[in-house]
């Protein structure tokens, strides 16, 4: 299967590209390398972690190169360039991953966030329609739901997002469905939550907890630690995406792809301190972040055969060991 990964040099994309290649598929990565990636990080390389983040993005690129996965330096905001690239390769499936994947940064710079989220999405959808792609997979977010109305929700929960990031993800879902309805483009929407794993540089919560524990001997929690997230190890998400790409029953469907069990920030912090002894500090809550909880994965289990493998404890242990090896 030939798969085009738009924004594929990012955290999720490079893991997905490597998994596709490992099983014999033909992935091609298209990325401008300007959002949460090498080019943007080089501009602010002062301090320990910005330098390490640059090294992580370089490792991503090296891994793609070592596995002979083409990395095309292409800005998906440029419709003409993107259409030429995809028309030449004619992928069977297109996966749209491009975004400014950070709630606070999205609220501070809505114009850039719109450009890299919706403009790239519309371009990719229209090129997919034009070349007759067999499947278009859109990478949405739990933030599209807005504040969860109950501790556990499924895919029928209404979309009532707060802030720029979640609103653009929800808007993207409506645009995807419009192309599905108007043009018959087979589409699949994936909603993840609280991802973590090697070579993440986008400031996700587990990344931040581990890095401040390593660097400062402290973990800082927003609020009292009772807020919950459905923490999901990156390889579980990748497994879910692969199942969705493979299964014809996933066409024109939306799936929660998570662990399926929310845990509190305090539980996460205590899990990190078990491996990295440090202090836990509590601070003010961030009102821009919606309340979340468990995202039920019954649909993905039933239709796709999805079964997450990583508990929070095992996933964090592996992630911390990766940091130790990377920094050695």
Regions from the PLM with identified roles:
Residues 55-58, 173, 207, 262, ...:
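Short, surface-exposed alpha-helical segments at coil->helix boundaries
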Residues 1-191:
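N-terminal Rossmann-like NAD(P)+-binding domain of SDR-like oxidoreductases, especially those catalyzing
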Residues 99-105, 141-144, 194-200, 226, ...:
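Active-site proximal helix/loop that lines the substrate pocket
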Residues 80, 92, 104, 111, ...:
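Residues in well-ordered alpha-helical elements
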Residues 22, 213-328:
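C-terminal substrate-binding subdomain of Rossmann-fold SDR/epimerase-dehydratase oxidoreductases
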Residues 171, 175, 179, 209, ...:
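Hydrophobic alpha-helix immediately C-terminal to the catalytic Tyr-X-X-X-Lys motif of short-chain
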Residues 85-89, 127, 212, 240, ...:
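CheY-like receiver
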Residues 106, 157, 187-198, 209-232, ...:
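A conserved pocket-lining segment of Rossmann-fold NAD(P)-dependent short-chain dehydrogenase/reductase
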């Amino acid at each position: 299967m030939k798969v085009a990964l738009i924004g594929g040099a990012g955290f999720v994309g490079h893991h997905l590209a490597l998994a596709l290649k490992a099983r014999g598929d033909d992935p091609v990565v298209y990325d401008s390398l300007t959002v949460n990636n090498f080019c943007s990080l080089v501009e602010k390389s002062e301090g320990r972690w910005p330098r390490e983040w640059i090294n992580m993005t370089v490792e991503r690129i090296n891994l793609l190169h070592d596995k002979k996965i083409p990395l095309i330096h292409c800005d998906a905001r440029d419709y003409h360039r993107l259409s030429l690239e995809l028309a030449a390769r004619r992928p069977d499936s297109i996966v749209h991953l491009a975004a400014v994947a950070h709630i606070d940064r999205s609220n501070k710079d809505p114009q850039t966030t719109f450009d890299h989220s919706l403009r790239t999405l519309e371009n990719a959808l229209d090129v997919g329609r034009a070349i007759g792609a067999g499947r278009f997979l859109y990478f949405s977010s739990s933030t599209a739901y807005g504040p969860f109305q109950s501790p556990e929700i499924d895919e029928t929960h209404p979309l009532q997002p707060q802030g720029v990031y979640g609103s653009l993800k929800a808007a993207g879902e409506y645009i995807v469905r419009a192309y599905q309805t108007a043009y018959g483009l087979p589409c699949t929407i994936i909603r993840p939550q609280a991802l973590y794993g090697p070579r993440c540089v986008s400031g996700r919560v587990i990344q931040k907890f581990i890095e401040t524990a390593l660097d400062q001997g402290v973990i800082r929690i927003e609020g009292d630690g009772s807020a919950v997230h459905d923490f999901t190890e990156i390889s579980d998400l990748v497994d879910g995406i692969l199942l969705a790409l493979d299964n014809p029953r996933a066409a024109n469907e939306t799936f929660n792809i998570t662990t399926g069990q929310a845990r509190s920030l305090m539980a996460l912090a205590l899990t990190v301190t078990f491996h990295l002894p440090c202090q836990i500090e509590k601070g003010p809550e961030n009102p821009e972040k919606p309340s979340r909880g468990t995202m039920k994965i019954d649909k993905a289990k039933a239709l796709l055969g999805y079964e997450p493998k990583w508990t929070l404890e095992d996933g964090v242990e592996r992630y911390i060991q990766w940091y130790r090896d990377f920094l050695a």
